């Protein structure tokens, strides 16, 4: 797809919209660590249960990565990110209303699915809408946003807990996600590939898997990221 470089002011605002979504993704990813004492008391959870809650997020997140690539190429970040974030709202509200460990776990999986496009969606858009000299900077800033989400999942959440409780914190997050969806639908550009026909032959997963360089990076990514998590 040909580049469609956006004016700098519009590009900055688009980055802000995408960054808000990725911030929420990071916040939801790490928040269970802060809430673990409360969840343990309220639901009589074990250490294994808490581990499963963290793993449920990654299960939902990872399960979407392969279909996500096709969906982003075909429909673009605007439709995909906003659609997936609707699932995140469902998962967040379900977590806030959960009455059992199974309810918490299912909600975490839904949240993982819902925020799974919050990084790859923006990176797909930046590739087309941002000039080459801004690509590395935009990627680095997205990682900074990730760290900010982790930070806000600690002390700010602890400050809010005695004020509104953990269930209402998730309700507030659901409202923030809804605002991000509206901003995405209003301001993210339309994906040019949507108006093209199906004559162009797209690559298959077998093409990717048959690439020797790709296969050589799998162990590095698997153990390196797994160790970090």
State where each predicted segment sits:
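Extracytoplasmic
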Residues: 14-45
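Juxtamembrane intracellular "pre-TM" segments in multi-pass secondary transporters
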Residues: 2-7, 191-218
